[in-house]
Curated annotation (Swiss-Prot):
Protein family (similarity comment): Belongs to the importin beta family. Importin beta-1 subfamily.
Repeat (HEAT) residue spans along the chain: 2-31, 33-64, 84-122, 128-159, 169-201, 211-246, 252-301, 313-359, 363-393, 401-437, 448-484, 499-536, 543-591, 599-638, 643-680, 685-723, 731-775, 785-828, 830-872
Main location: cytoplasm
Region (IAB-binding): 328-341
Domain of life: Eukaryota
In-chain residues carrying the UniProt-annotated modification N-acetylmethionine: M1
Known function: Functions in nuclear protein import, either in association with an adapter protein, like an importin-alpha subunit, which binds to nuclear localization signals (NLS) in cargo substrates, or by acting as autonomous nuclear transport receptor. Acting autonomously, serves itself as NLS receptor. Docking of the importin/substrate complex to the nuclear pore complex (NPC) is mediated by KPNB1 through binding to nucleoporin FxFG repeats and the complex is subsequently translocated through the pore by an energy requiring, Ran-dependent mechanism.
Recorded GO CC terms: cytoplasm; cytoplasmic stress granule; endoplasmic reticulum tubular network; NLS-dependent protein nuclear import complex; nuclear envelope; nuclear pore; nucleoplasm; nucleus
Organism: Rattus norvegicus
GO molecular function annotations of the record: enzyme binding; Hsp90 protein binding; importin-alpha family protein binding; kinesin binding; nuclear import signal receptor activity; nuclear localization sequence binding; protein domain specific binding; protein-containing complex binding
Positions where N6-acetyllysine occurs in the chain: K210, K834, K866
Gene name of the record: Kpnb1
Designated name of the protein: Importin subunit beta-1
């Protein structure tokens, strides 16, 4: 009885009672978990207990599982370690509970699933699935029994690795289809079954491969889309959306007779959830068909037929889809919150996908709607017309769109002053897309001046409009810079089409970053990002404005650092950190543009601010990363002159290298070590012992994220290049580390791991290259220090030979391997020739490199081949 009373107190309005109850339960779980679980499951199984006690007991049992995969695995092990008798008792009680609960959702179904996900993978509880199937198919089962059992099946399918259920798919499907049939009187049962089907689709491939079973499943799902209960209808449509993605190749039989009509009807529904699924179906069709188009072009390049082919459903349905989608665009809500997903937003996304998928074919279907409504007195229609226009800018041939966009420019400029904020917002977004996708239409002589005028005014508009205007400026600056004329002997243009307005734009953006409503719609960060793009893409005659901007950013950074002591709340701290990060990133961008002599004048102040930031932000990884990146830029701009800051900066570099818990910070610190080596050359030597020790510790530490390790290996090469023969004292341990790293193996079916392996190999090759070049020296005569690597040359060439035989190698790996072969030839001469001759795959790798489309691989492979030929001629 005591347990029931305590469980009932877990919902007590009295805080003290509530805390006491929670403490009691936590203590009971620690003191004797098996007994505690048996007692809880007994409370859950007894229909005589209060609903509150039963729900609370179910919740306590469910706390045995977790959404976090690592914690979940620990909990599952903990459950399996409990005595088999206690486990059996708990399982019997939770199974008995199914069908006895009068409340929804069922607690027991979640408990059954939690236990099943721990036991089925280790071949325990074999009687569970047959028992669940019997609960559903037994004609005497109650509605509650069928519903809660189907819920349990759905949860198991959702949470377990699909491979674990492959051999049970027939039984599970039998139960699910039984619950979905149109003869089933209860909509609650139908809903539970339809949701369970949605979760089971991944592992029922064998059933979809068989025509008769597929027909039956499709028939039941299509019938469920006509159910009068909205919940069932939505769940059935969700199934169709997912089936389309998983089993596209089988859908031809059903598209004409059923799917087309069902989904078109759903799109027209006044019920948002139904309309959303109808639109989502066609968005998925586009996604699939775009993937198939890529597959087809890759197959054509390789001269083979594609494995799967597109049926071009999207293209065929355009004339029916576009009118519904454009009509749906007119249903927007004036006070719409950005986070609410609704049919109007989904229609915009679907139009964009159709545009990318069907290319030129979409234009004639959308154009009449745009022309008819872009000046409609009703703001909803004006907005829909602009939205439709913005949505079709990517996909069709730019030359087909350009005349239309140029023709629309005056109207769009006018709509930037529309009385409706929604229309202004959409127009600003559309102008941004034009600047990004068809910039020639924006930077033409006729419209550039009025466009700039309306964009500058737009920065003072509501945050949602101004935020889109910032993005338009970013794209415009990039396009203007690309289009500018650059003299042959110069790296950047002397002037460009934004020069005359440059100072005003920068001034307005700086004002925008300071707006009191800057936290709305991401406006502040959009304005800073836009400022960075504009400065990055500025011509030479804008330099005075860049100088001014640099001073403003430095001043702001100092002001922000002085605010630190006044921060009270967590939300203030978050805003403060965000602002520091934005200022750091902006500083980085302006420093890139600052001339060397100017950089020398401001570097003391910049470095003092950054050092202060490191002192104050030890707790914030994001800011540390941005500050390290800013130091990186300063190092590149100052070169050897950075040496004077090293003593003061060294401790913070160390903190960054040790901060492996936040791998982005650690990565930035490792990257910075490489920059320092390139800038300071041999002057980095006094700092190397400490840096090398930290780098080697990180390599040996299992808690360091794997992405950091390749970067560390390649930085060993940078260090050798900087300090030459002084690297000898680290050589043995580094060569052993490289030998170990170059023998790494990964699971080839995991594409992420294949990418990682290539990255790791590329880094090993870069490190070997740096070591050979650094020890060899850059004089005509090879320095004898390089002979310390001689005993490893055969291993290095075997490593390259192994890479050559691995068909997953990338162009980057080929380039690095070729470069290293060339360096080995110049360092060790004819010994290398013999070792290469014995490995014919290396020649194939060099041939592949010479034929590569990437410049680096081509150049290095050609050079390495020449070096080998030289040695052959000498021999």
């Amino acid at each position: 009885m005591e347990l029931i009373t305590i469980l009932e107190k877990t919902v007590s309005p009295d805080r003290l009672e509530l805390e006491a109850a929670q403490k009691f339960l936590e203590r009971a779980a620690v003191e004797n978990l098996p007994t505690f679980l048996v007692e809880l499951s007994r409370v859950l199984a007894n229909p005589g207990n209060s609903q509150v006690a039963r729900v609370a007991a179910g919740l306590q049992i469910r706390l045995l599982t977790s959404k976090d995969p690592d914690i979940k695995a620990q909990y599952q092990q903990r459950w399996l370690a409990i005595d088999a008798n206690a486990r059996r008792e708990v399982k019997n009680y939770v199974l008995q509970t199914l069908g006895t609960e009068t409340y929804r959702p069922s607690s027991a179904s979640q408990c059954v699933a939690g236990i099943a996900c721990a036991e089925i993978p280790v071949s325990q509880w074999p009687e569970l699935i047959p028992q669940l199937v019997a609960n559903v198919t037994n004609p005497n089962s109650t509605e509650h029994m069928k519903e809660s059992t189907l819920e349990a099946i759905g949860y198991i399918c959702q949470d377990i690795d699909p491979e674990q259920l492959q051999d049970k798919s027939n039984e599970i499907l039998t139960a699910i289809i039984q619950g979905m049939r149109k003869e089933e009187p209860s909509n609650n049962v139908k809903l539970a079954a339809t949701n369970a089907l949605l979760n089971s689709l991944e592992f029922t491939k064998a059933n979809f491969d068989k025509e008769s079973e597929r027909h039956f499943i499709m028939q039941v799902v299509c019938e469920a889309t006509q159910c009068p209960d909205t919940r069932v209808r939505v769940a059935a449509l969700q199934n169709l959306v997912k089936i389309m993605s998983l089993y596209y190749q089988y859908m031809e039989t059903y598209m004409g007779p059923a799917l087309f009509a069902i989904t078109i009807e759903a799109m027209k529904s006044d019920i948002d959830e139904v309309a959303l699924q109808g639109i989502e179906f066609w968005s998925n069709v586009c996604d699939e068909e775009m993937d198939l188009a890529i597959e087809a072009s890759e197959a054509a390049e390789q001269g083979r037929p594609p494995e799967h082919t597109s049926k071009f459903y999207a293209k065929g349905a355009l004339q029916y889809l576009v009118p519904i989608l454009t009509q749906t665009l007119t249903k927007q809500d004036e006070n719409d919150d950005d986070d609410d997903w609704n049919p109007c937003k989904a229609a915009g996304v679907c139009l964009m996908l159709l545009s990318t998928c069907c290319e030129d074919d979409i234009v004639p279907h959308v154009l009449p709607f745009i022309k008819e409504h872009i000046k409609n007195p009703d703001w909803r229609y004006r907005d829909a017309a602009v939205m439709a226009f913005g949505s079709i800018l990517e996909g069709p041939e730019p030359n087909q769109l350009k005349p239309l966009v140029i023709q629309a420019m005056p109207t769009l400029i006018e709509l930037m002053k529309d009385p409706s904020v929604v229309v202004r917002d959409t127009t600003a977004w559309t102008v941004g897309r034009i600047c990004e996708l068809l910039p020639e239409a924006a930077i033409n002589d006729v419209y550039l001046a009025p466009l700039l005028q309306c964009l500058i005014e737009g920065l003072s508009a509501e945050p949602r409009v101004a935020s889109n205007v910032c993005w338009a400026f970013s794209s415009l600056a990039e396009a203007a810079y690309e289009a500018a004329d650059v003299a042959d002997d110069q790296e950047e243009p002397a002037t460009y089409c934004l020069s005359s307005s440059f100072e005003l734009i920068v001034q307005k953006l700086l004002e925008t970053t300071d707006r009191p409503d800057g936290h709305q719609n991401n406006l502040r960060s959009s304005a800073y990002e836009s400022l960075m793009e504009i400065v990055k893409n500025s011509a030479k005659d804008c330099y005075p404005a860049v100088q001014k901007t640099t001073l403003v950013i430095m001043e702001r950074l100092q002001q922000v650092l002085q605010m630190e002591s006044h921060i009270q709340s967590t939300s203030d701290r978050i805003q403060f950190n965000d602002l520091q990060s934005l200022l750091c990133a902006t500083l980085q961008n302006v420093l890139w543009k600052v001339q060397h002599q100017d950089a020398l004048q401001i570097s003391d102040v910049v470095m003092a601010s950054l050092l202060r930031m490191f002192q104050s932000t030890a707790g914030s990884g994001g800011v540390q990363e941005d500050a390290l990146m800013a130091v990186s830029t300063l190092v590149e701009v100052l070169g050897g002159e950075f040496l004077k800051y090293m003593e003061a900066f060294k401790p913070f570099l160390g903190i960054g290298l040790k901060n492996y818990a936040e791998c982005q910070v650690c990565l930035a610190a490792v990257g910075l070590v490489g920059d320092l080596c390139r800038a300071l050359q041999s002057n980095i030597l006094p700092f190397c012992d400490e840096v090398m020790q930290l780098l080697l510790e990180n390599l040996g530490n299992e808690n360091v994220h794997r992405s950091v390790k390749p970067q560390i290996l390649s930085v060993f090469g940078d260090i050798t290049l900087a300090i030459g023969g002084e690297f000898k004292k680290y050589l043995e341990v580094v060569l052993n580390t490289l030998q170990q790293a170059s023998q790494a193996q990964v699971d080839k079916s995991d594409f992420d791991m294949v990418d990682y392996l290539n990255e790791l190999r590329e880094s090993c090759l870069e490190a070997y290259t740096g070591i050979v070049q650094g020890l060899k020296g850059d004089q005509e005569n090879v320095h004898p220090d390089v002979m310390l690597v001689q005993p490893r040359v055969e291993f290095i060439l075997s490593f390259i030979d192994h890479i050559a035989g691995d068909e997953d190698h990338t162009d980057g790996v080929v380039a690095c391997a070729a470069g290293l072969i060339g360096d080995l030839c110049t360092a060790f001469g004819k010994d290398v020739l013999k070792l290469v001759e014995a490995r014919p795959m290396i020649h194939e790798l060099l041939t592949e490199g010479r034929r590569s489309k990437t410049n680096k691989a081509k150049t290095l492979a050609t050079w390495a081949t020449k070096e080998l030929r030289k040695l052959k001629n000498q021999a």
